[in-house]
Amino acid sequence: MRPLAELIRPNIRTLAPYSTARDEYGGQRIDVWLDANESPYDNGVNRYPDPRQQRLREMLAARKGIAADRIFIGSGSDEAIDLAYRIFCVPGRDNAVSISPTYGMYRVAADTNDVELREVPLGDDFSLPVERLLAAADERSKLLWLCSPNNPTGNAF
C-alpha cells in the first residue's frame, strides 16, 4: 500500500497554506488587525476564527492519543466529501467507487469536480457487494465511499 501523501495530487501536495498577518505576527500582542477589518473591542465575535482550528485539533488529539495533524475539522460531511475529491482525484481522469443507493452528496461532489463515480448496486437484501465493488475499481480509482450505517437504507456494513 502506498503512503497517503503519494496519493495526493502533486499540485495540491505542494500548495503553501494560506497565511494571514496573524500567522506571521502571531507571537506579538496586536489588538488591531486592519488587514482583516476586525474590531479591537472584544465582544465574542470580533475576530475571525482560526481557519486551521489548531487549538481544537490539539485538544482532540490529546484526548484521543493521536497527532493533531491527523485530525480534520470541517463544516460537515459535505465539505469533507468535496475536499476528498479535490485532494485525491484529477478532474476528467480519476474515478471513485460507491454503493447505490447511498448518500447523494457523493454524486453531487463527483459531478462538481468532474470525477467519474462508479455506482455498484447493493444486493436485493441491501447486502454489500464486495466482489462487484472491487471489480468496479481500477488504477484510476482514488476513492471508495462506504456509508455505514448507509443512507438511505439504514443498514450497517
Placement of each model-derived feature along the sequence:
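Conserved PLP-anchoring active-site segment centered on the Schiff-base-forming lysine
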Residues: I87-A109, G123
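Phosphate-binding glycine-rich loop
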Residues: R57-N95, N113
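Short glycine-rich anion-binding loops that position phosphate/pyrophosphate groups of nucleotides
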Residues: N37-P40, S77, Y103, P149-P152
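Short beta-strand->loop structural element characteristic of the AMP-binding/adenylate-forming
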Residues: E116-L122
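Glycine/Thr-rich phosphate-binding loops of Rossmann-like dinucleotide-binding domains
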Residues: D42-G44, I81-D82, Y106-R107, T153-G154
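N-terminal "arm"/small-domain region of PLP-dependent enzymes with the aminotransferase-like
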Residues: M1-R63, L146
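Active-site phosphate-binding strand-loop segment of PLP-dependent enzymes
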Residues: D124-F157
